[in-house]
Amino acid sequence: MAKRQVFFSFEYNKDSWRASQVRNMGKVDSNSTFSDNDWEEVKEKSDAKIKEWINDQLAKRSCLVVLVGSTTSSRKWVNYEIEKAYELNKGIVGIHVHKLKNQNGDQVSKGSNPFYNFLIGKNKERLSKYVTCFDSSYS
């Protein structure tokens, strides 16, 4: 099976450890991931520069994987990444990562589906009707 060029979307401050675990599972092309240092550098920039960076990253990828932690669905940049990936007709999927342990061995409560927040099409249907958000089997 071919590996996809993936852009991972997640709440950096709370879920970067969990995101690293997912990235290190080896299920996606290593060229598709960015380092924690990339986000550390870009998060200090203006909103316009952050959007530019996200747009550039998404343009190089075939799909968006949203790693859903306890409060991911309320995060500004995660929501922007979902909106932009939808506009660019990228594949989109979500994975609940609440069962993965952080660096202290702690798990968190399951977060709400971030795709539920988006209304699409003429009939204003919820994106969550079309985009799956899986539960991680890892813990």
Regions found by a protein language model. Give the residues of each.
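C-terminal interaction surface of TIR/SEFIR-family domains
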Residues: 1-7, 14, 18, 103-139
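A broadly tuned preference for mixed-charge, low-complexity surface segments
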Residues: 50-65, 116-126
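Flexible, active-site-adjacent loop/turn segments at secondary-structure boundaries
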Residues: 37, 48, 75-76, 113-116
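Conserved protein kinase catalytic core
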Residues: 42-43, 100-102
